[in-house]
UniProtKB/Swiss-Prot annotation:
This is 2-succinyl-5-enolpyruvyl-6-hydroxy-3-cyclohexene-1-carboxylate synthase. It catalyses: isochorismate + 2-oxoglutarate + H(+) = 5-enolpyruvoyl-6-hydroxy-2-succinyl-cyclohex-3-ene-1-carboxylate + CO2. Belongs to the TPP enzyme family. MenD subfamily. It is an enzyme of class 2 (transferase). It comes from Nocardioides sp. (strain ATCC BAA-499 / JS614).
Amino acid sequence: MTAPEPAPESATATARRILAALVEAGVTEIVVAPGSRNAPLSFAAYDAAAAGLVRLHTRLDERTAGFLALGLTRSGRRAAVVCTSGTAVANLHPAVLEAAHAGVDLVVVSADRPARLRGTGANQTTDQVGIFGPLVPTQDASGPVELLTAGPVHLNVPLEEPLVPDDRWLPDVVPGEPAHRVIPASLTVLARGPRTVVVAGDDAGPRVRVLAEQAGWPLLAEPSSGSRTGDNAIRTYRLLLDGDLGARVERVVVGGHPTLSRPVSRLLARPDVEVVDLGAWGVWSERPFPVHSRILGGVGVDAPVDAADGTADDTDWLEEWRTADRAVSARLDALLAAEPGLTPHEVAGAVARALPAGGLLVVGASSPIRDLDLMVPRYDVGARRKVVANRGLAGIDGTISTAVGAALGRPRSTRALTLMGDVTFLHDAGALVIGPGEAVPDLTIVVVNDDGGSIFAMLEQGAAEYADQYDRLFGTPHRVDLASLCAATRTPHWRVDSLAELEHALASPAGGIEVVEAVVRRDNRRDLDERIRALRP
């Protein structure tokens, strides 16, 4: 006589098992988008939050929920986003793609209909296994939950009815710590010889800055690199690269994910320049430029040699960059000060100056992060300012949600700012819809409003021969009244059109989420950018 097969696990039991596994893996933040099929997971998350094991966030829209979880993770928390079946899962795709390309450990938990219903036309049923493509394989939720892989994880959870519990859950779970990436213990020593610059792309981290200082090399660091501190950081590097100094570079040591400037891209692609890659996380670890050597462990430089033997590198190399940087910076500041009205560069500079030690700044893609790149001051080492940008795929979507999540993941006493363009703001305006009882950070959103997209004015599409098509296809003026939009969500709003007004608004945060709209011109953007590029020596 054969033993009876065990009863299948109930939806409630499955959901509680998965929530317990998430907590044991170090997840401390759960973002839920409402739905019926994910109800068992939502109830389990609610009970885990009531037990003090996680913090629960609810959002109406899955795209917002996904980027909120991404921002929480970027701030150092471990977050999971929970959604129902069907198109709800597809709306998480932008956040998942960004996480995959940036190496962010986002956890996605999607509820699903039973597998037998796939391909039958059943309501809200599609094939969710592998929905995010080969970048993010789907885990079978019937087995052990595995969260040790770098980058996003997708757990797909088929759930049978009933979808509501019979009792409250009192979880007996020991919270775990997220797994941390470990740099291999090996050490590679670089020769000082060639004229070298250090390029720090997004999320390069402080070790890139340390290497530049040890070697005495110029540091060309993007704002979100985590490296733009200390005396070796060169503010106007992208202007200098197009001049004589850039032409004399013989070697580049690159860390992180550099994506901001064409001068850096051209430098890395030059056949006469040796490129040393310090390695990177995310699916972009294979570089789009030739790499001569890759270092996955620690890195240092050899000891200085005696200049008398004629083999020492050019000891004036760093000072040449510093001197040129000071001169170009002074000319840039003078040019901007002479401009009538407020410029987007001045907005970026004011935001950078308003960021205190220990503060958080989330920067949107497109023009604002490039303007910030020219204007951010050389911050002090150890001041622990954190600049975050979604540079994995460099999209404008989800920027407000990312900023809200990143701010929620930081201590409440930390000043949090975000800088973005008006199109980026409108793209994620739904992130301002936050229900009663939800955690709300102190966050100042600075919107550079030029009534459309100005970055294309600086690209080929902005050339004079396309003027009759430009606005409709690329400039995309929208004429949205941001004050009214903010009023609809009861978000405080200030409109400024001078540097003095902007600095006053930034110096007097109201608490909670607030929007400071800085109005700038768009019609002169291409001309202004050309005059800035002409400042290079």
